[in-house]
């Protein structure tokens, strides 16, 4: 694509680690093991994902940019043919009127040679919690259960009003979620996204989720700039292990 057009197939932001984390999540893998320890060195899935990601960057398949503003510019400026990200990025796409009808939603590519690999992952989103300090736990739990936990009418109301989409599967069957979206060529993007969400592998978000992303992302940038893979991954492992002791 880049050789023929000067454009990139995908774009990715160098400091956030979103793309690499989604690759890992699509395989049901993590940079922290079940015992809560740093798990980068010796993690076969992590090493495959990192090597693949580096190859995509070095071969001009993925444009690796330095910050979020540059990332958005590659999307709105038409420098990349596609992006891998969460549903929330659709708002950025839809701000570019001249690209109306040129985009559609599909599954992400699968990581080769990993038995647990899928075409599905998640990035971002929000969660609701009832804390131990709540004055009326039963009332709070009932509220969440009767709205976010079970009401398709509730989701039908907040989608057009606030653009809030749910991964609550029954919501995806409603008329509102199945409305064609003109920007995406008439594709019912919200019901499509909800259906995709049902296939995402289980993924435990540890307290060191963002620290692990930061360490691995630094390793990727170092590898792209010439640091041997083994050295970069060992540094990421050691740095993450140290952060876990702070």
Model-derived segments and spans:
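Short, well-structured alpha-helical segments that form the helix of a local strand-helix-strand
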Residues: 1, 229-242
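Glycine-centered hinge/linker elements that transmit conformational signals in sensory
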Residues: 1-2, 35-65, 108
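Pocket-flanking alpha-helical
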Residues: 1-7, 73, 90-96, 241
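Extracytoplasmic/periplasmic solute-binding protein
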Residues: 1-39, 45-46, 80
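Bilobed periplasmic-binding protein-like "clamshell/Venus-flytrap" ligand-binding domains
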Residues: 2-14, 150-162, 242-246
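Alpha-to-beta junction loops
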Residues: 4-7, 77-86, 101
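Short helix-initiation/N-cap motifs at beta->coil->alpha
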Residues: 63-77
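C-terminal lobe and pocket-closing loops
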Residues: 89-100, 112-214
């Amino acid at each position: 694509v880049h050789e023929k057009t000067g454009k990139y197939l995908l774009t990715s932001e160098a400091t956030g680690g979103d793309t690499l984390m989604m690759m890992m999540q699509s395989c049901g893998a993590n940079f922290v093991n079940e015992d809560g320890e740093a798990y980068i060195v010796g993690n076969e899935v992590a090493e495959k994902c990192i090597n693949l990601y580096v190859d995509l960057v070095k071969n001009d398949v993925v444009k690796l940019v330095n910050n979020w503003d540059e990332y958005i510019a590659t999307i709105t400026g038409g420098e990349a043919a596609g992006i891998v990200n969460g549903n929330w990025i659709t708002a950025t796409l839809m701000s570019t009127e001249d690209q109306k009808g040129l985009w559609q939603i599909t599954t992400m590519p699968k990581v080769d040679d990993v038995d647990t690999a899928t075409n599905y992952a998640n990035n971002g989103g929000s969660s609701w919690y009832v804390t131990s300090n709540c004055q009326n736990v039963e009332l709070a739990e009932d509220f969440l259960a009767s709205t976010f936990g079970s009401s398709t009418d509730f989701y039908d109301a907040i989608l057009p009003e606030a653009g809030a989409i749910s991964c609550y599967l029954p919501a995806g069957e409603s008329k509102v979620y199945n409305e064609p979206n003109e920007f995406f060529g008439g594709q019912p993007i919200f019901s499509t996204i909800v259906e995709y969400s049902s296939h995402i592998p289980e993924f435990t978000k540890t307290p060191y989720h963002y620290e692990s992303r930061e360490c691995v992302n630094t390793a990727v940038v170092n590898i792209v700039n010439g640091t041997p893979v083994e050295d970069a991954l060992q540094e990421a492992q050691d740095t993450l292990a140290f952060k876990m002791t702070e």
